[in-house]
Amino acid sequence: TQRSRDVANQLSSGIKHLLKKNKVTVFDGFGYLDKKTTEVKKVIVRLKNNTKTLELTAKNIIIATGARSRNLPFVSSDAINIWDYKTAMTPPKLPSSLVIIGSGAIGMEFASFYNDLGVNVTVVEALNTILPNEDEDISQVVASNFKKRGIIIKTNTLLKSVTNKT
């Protein structure tokens, strides 16, 4: 576990060095693409310290979104068998089965990973397709591949509650 954190920190430092070396300006904040602009790529960035908002234009723009788990209103904060992505990366022990809520890129990556380790995986998605931010044909190919591997996919499924199993 500590080794994986050390490697991640080393890679992160290396990327920062390469960006600086190649004179890439990095803005730490919250950004979104301006949908009104079609010819020029424009991004609006609110800096992390909330001091100001910038409008940036560039030929090439990279938005590194990062990842953060979302609190779900129907999940008890004292639930002991509910993991966020950090726990899923370094589980206390390998479960025999796992339900993954959400089929975005991170959820599907965990589904594949745990399936490869022999865990029975079910993915639950509220929308009608997995990987809802991707092209439909990509979603269909991934769904077909995952089903062949034994991953259960439940789309159009809304969770109402999650409880601890004792």
Task: Give the positions of each predicted feature.
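Glycine-rich active-site loop/strand segments that organize a redox cofactor
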Residues: 1-3
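FAD-binding core/adjacent interface of flavoenzyme oxidoreductases
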Residues: 9-101, 158
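Rossmann-like dinucleotide-binding cores of NAD(P)H-dependent redox enzymes
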Residues: 6-12, 16, 89-90, 95-99, ...
